[in-house]
């Protein structure tokens, strides 16, 4: 569908099949668990509220323009899955929740994504397009692998890891490639 999907109530809602949903997703309370490899084709916003969780259930999930989260809640549990975050060209998304699990994160799209929490996921980070900005000390797990991999090096495109002014980041391994 194309309308806004809002998750309310403290219970867990599990979407049991792979889904492709093109409207915005807002998680205001409780947990939304993905039951299969899925695509949330529009913005995904998590409230800064205790108990608010997007749980990938170990699946690979595509989201666009991730935002929200915070010190009280609004976290993402990867399990062993891969979270693919696409930020549209010209957009600047900020996520302040914690991303945890053994899975990995892939940053796509030519916009920027700022991670503003000390994330604990261990599966590594791949930046294939746009900018991923470290907006807090060690936003990426210090033992994790980071790959900056781009097939385009045109003006204003490509892939970039940015450590924002005043912050530091320890990286387990850093590698890059271009096409």
Residues covered by each model-derived region:
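Beta-strand repeat architectures
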Residues: 1-14, 22-93, 100-114, 122-179
């Amino acid at each position: 569908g194309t309308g806004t999907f809002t998750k309310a109530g403290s219970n867990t809602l599990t979407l049991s099949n792979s889904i492709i949903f093109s409207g915005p997703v807002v998680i205001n309370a409780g947990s939304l668990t993905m039951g299969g490899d899925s695509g949330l084709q529009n913005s995904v916003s998590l409230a800064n509220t205790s108990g608010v969780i997007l749980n990938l259930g170990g699946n690979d999930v595509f989201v666009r323009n991730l935002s929200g989260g915070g010190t009280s809640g609004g976290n993402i549990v990867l399990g062993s899955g891969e979270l693919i975050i696409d930020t549209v060209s010209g957009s600047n998304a900020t996520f302040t929740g914690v991303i945890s699990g053994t899975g990995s994160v892939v940053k796509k799209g030519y916009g920027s994504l700022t991670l503003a929490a000390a994330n604990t996921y261990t599966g590594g980070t791949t930046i294939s397009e746009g900018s991923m900005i470290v907006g807090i000390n060690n936003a990426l797990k210090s033992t994790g692998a980071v790959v900056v991999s781009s097939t385009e090096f045109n003006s204003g495109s490509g892939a970039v890891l940015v450590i924002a002014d005043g912050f530091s980041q320890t990286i387990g391994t850093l590698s890059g490639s271009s096409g």
